[in-house]
């Protein structure tokens, strides 16, 4: 993502330090101070030096993970998530089979640290518990212990500019409803894509050599796609995506509801069954921080009822809720997601079964681009060899 931002000439969004607290439904169990040194002292008082030891361990995992950039620079490609993880570290695929709780317990960390700090990162980032597989757990921890950044004007500017600045890309705003595998001259696979444009029910058709899917393949997705003519027409995952509700509220926060004396910028939950919400945070402009913003973003696993919102806020002016299937329901049940579904049919979102994040999507997208490029040119070169060979055989006869 950093390379994309630099390539496109975009800017990092300025941010100010935000104070964060962890809430268990009864009380605030940890609250950051305005002074960093006091926050460290509070952290050590409650958890000892284990948080810092865990950050070092997560850093070692990130260092191994970063090998993927060198591999992709050298044109390495991967057809499934296990081979991608294996290329970074032989131990990484095993992390998909162990829960983050059992993995961290085996490393010698306390239940208290796991049930409060580790669980908080998972609740906030994925709306899930410590029974998720270890790799996504470490990705979640990486997001908590390292400097994160965003793009000025909104992170969506990265894909928008990558698409619209490329004059060779033709964007067709439409919904794809069906993909049919057809054979051309009995040898070459082509894909017939059926779609209808926005605000229209007329079915359109187009044929492509390569099709890349950048959507979750689940049975209950909002805009389902059917597949026909493939050896196996069911490319859908047996697992599910986690449904998350984002609620935006323009109002004044009631600190006492959370056991606070004054407002904080972020309130994170370590027990969503008791807190109802996963997190609550002050929402700033995508152009930069707004002083004293009274717009709040709340994540929860269920829609918030108006009485709950009124208990948390006063002077409520506006409420907006958005529900979406945000990321997979992670577990230790092995799901061998594939980047290559058929000869020239590819799936970017396979990488989400490792972990869902913008950087992961960028890596998955690049892998599929490299994979499609390699496959196409292998086929193209092979066809050229066949044509040249046939021509050489015919030449003597024609002479």
Regions found by a protein language model. Name each.
Residues 59-192, 197-199:
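Active-site/ligand-binding neighborhood in enzyme catalytic cores
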Residues 275-399:
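Conserved flavin/dinucleotide-binding core of flavoenzymes
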Residues 1-71:
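Dinucleotide-binding Rossmann-like beta1-alpha1 core, especially the glycine-rich loop
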Residues 166, 208-209, 342:
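Short, well-ordered alpha-helix to beta-strand connector turns
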Residues 172, 212, 247, 346-348:
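Hydrophobic/aromatic beta-strand patches that form the interior of the parallel beta-sheet core
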Residues 13-15, 170-172, 322, 346:
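General small-molecule cofactor/ligand-binding pocket signal
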Residues 178-316:
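Mid-domain catalytic core of redox enzymes
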Residues 49-52, 63-77, 87, 91, ...:
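Eukaryotic N-terminal low-complexity, Ser/Thr- and Lys/Arg-rich leader segments
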């Amino acid at each position: 993502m950093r390379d994309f931002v630099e390539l496109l000439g975009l800017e990092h969004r300025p941010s100010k330090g935000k104070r964060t607290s962890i809430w268990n439904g009864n009380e605030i169990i940890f609250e950051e101070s305005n002074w960093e040194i006091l926050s460290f002292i509070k952290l050590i008082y409650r958890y000892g030096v284990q948080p810092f030891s865990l950050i070092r361990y997560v850093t070692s995992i990130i260092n191994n993970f970063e090998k993927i950039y060198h591999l992709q620079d050298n044109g390495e490609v991967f057809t499934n998530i296990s081979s991608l993880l294996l290329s970074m570290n032989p131990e990484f695929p095993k992390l998909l089979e162990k829960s983050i709780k059992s993995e961290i317990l085996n490393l010698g960390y306390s239940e208290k640290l796991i049930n409060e700090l580790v669980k908080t990162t998972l609740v906030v980032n994925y709306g899930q518990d410590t029974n998720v597989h270890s790799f996504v757990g470490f990705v979640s921890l990486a997001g908590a212990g390292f400097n994160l950044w965003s793009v000025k004007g909104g992170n969506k500017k990265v894909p928008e500019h990558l698409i619209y600045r490329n004059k060779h890309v033709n964007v067709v705003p439409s919904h794809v409803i069906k993909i049919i595998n057809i054979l051309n001259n009995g040898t070459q696979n082509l894909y017939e894509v059926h779609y209808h444009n926005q605000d229209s029910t007329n079915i359109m058709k187009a044929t492509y050599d390569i099709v890349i899917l950048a959507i979750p393949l689940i049975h209950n997705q909002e805009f389902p796609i059917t597949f026909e003519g493939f050896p196996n027409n069911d490319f859908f995952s047996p697992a599910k995506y986690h449904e998350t509700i984002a609620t935006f509220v323009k109002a004044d926060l009631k600190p006492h509801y959370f056991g606070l004396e004054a407002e904080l910028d972020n309130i994170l939950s370590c027990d969503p069954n008791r807190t109802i919400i996963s997190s609550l945070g002050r929402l700033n402009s995508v152009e930069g921080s707004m002083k004293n913003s009274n717009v709040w973003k709340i994540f929860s696993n269920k829609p918030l009822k108006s009485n709950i919102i009124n208990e948390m806020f006063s002077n409520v002016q506006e409420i907006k809720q958005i529900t979406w299937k945000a990321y997979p329901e992670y577990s230790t049940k092995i799901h061998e997601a594939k980047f290559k579904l058929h000869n020239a049919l590819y799936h970017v979102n396979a990488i989400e079964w490792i972990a869902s994040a913008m950087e992961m999507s960028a890596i998955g997208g690049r892998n599929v681009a490299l994979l499609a490029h390699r496959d196409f040119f292998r086929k193209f070169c092979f066809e050229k060899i066949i044509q040249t060979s046939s021509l050489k055989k015919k030449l003597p006869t024609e002479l």
